[in-house]
């Protein structure tokens, strides 16, 4: 297996649901970070990019018909570059990076772009076809998040718990208290607010320019953060699934919009295209768990990856764990033997504060882990996340 390097990485700001990026189509949004990779890398012969891999979880609206291909064309990349859209739900963007890594490591490719996009604000309502000409049981499905067009066999065999219900299942099964969840959520908000104030995220963000009748709006900051959050305010929120449960809007991730893109290259491509390697991709691994506790999915994925690499979780200087819910984040950390407030975990906050645009988030985790390693001087970084329907994904990098 050959070395594979991440040579550049950029993302858009993360928009709040119905917020600043709500007017931007998913394909246009995906084109923003792709286009932003071109100017800083003038020596790259772009027509020699082997593939653009892009993750996207929905694909029911404007992100249909292979958004990766449409976005690369909209970004002005050569028509000769093929593009493919991957869907591993929440981990789609990370899977795109891992897929590019494997193709280059095997020798099949030399140069690729990988990333992800999601516009949850613009997720459409959809309706299936009638089973008869006079059917009256038509159902309109909201594609923003969660189940749709449920298979009766899936429901009877595994259940079709909503995402908040799976988070409460994890809280119950792994004994994660409401107090611990709220404290975890508060730390996420505080760390993200501090990082934003210090300009940490500005270095990984490309502004999104939105034209309108009165001129132009420039979106350049993540807008989901709530720096005014207090523990008192979090404790007052009502549980989503009933009074005896613990998951709330405050200790869960957001519904958001965003896109990210990274350049991956072999050692030969680095030299040929004048690229600067920033990190080496060490590997990626996935794991499966019961769908009702999908949030614990990172545990088998991380264990598989660390065993394969011959390292321990404690060897990672940065761990970017997607905060789908505080309950699952805490359960994962405890199962992996990591302290609730370990300084190497999400040092700049996580999805509870920053938001969780599904197809983008996995790429954002890898990008932010790389950025933090460069800032801190650390060597190894781990990005991991749970996945709907009971999966986990983990990817490791090493700064060079």
UniProtKB/Swiss-Prot annotation:
Domain of life: Bacteria
Keyword Acyltransferase: yes
UniProtKB keywords: Acyltransferase, Aromatic hydrocarbons catabolism, Transferase
GO biological process: 3,4-dihydroxybenzoate catabolic process; beta-ketoadipate pathway
Molecular-function GO term, any one: 3-oxoadipyl-CoA thiolase activity
Pathway(s): Aromatic compound metabolism; beta-ketoadipate pathway; acetyl-CoA and succinyl-CoA from 3-oxoadipate: step 2/2
EC annotation from Swiss-Prot or TrEMBL: 2.3.1.174
Enzyme class per UniProt: transferase
Reaction(s) catalysed (UniProt annotation): succinyl-CoA + acetyl-CoA = 3-oxoadipyl-CoA + CoA
Active site: 90 (acyl-thioester intermediate), 356 (proton acceptor), 386 (proton acceptor)
Gene3D superfamilies in the cross-refs: 3.40.47.10
Pfam families in the cross-refs: Thiolase_C, Thiolase_N
Family affiliation: Belongs to the thiolase-like superfamily. Thiolase family.
Task of the protein: Catalyzes thiolytic cleavage of beta-ketoadipyl-CoA to succinyl-CoA and acetyl-CoA.
PANTHER family xrefs: ACETYL-COA ACETYLTRANSFERASE, CYTOSOLIC, ACETYL-COA C-ACYLTRANSFERASE
Name under which the protein is recorded: Beta-ketoadipyl-CoA thiolase
Gene name linked to the record: pcaF
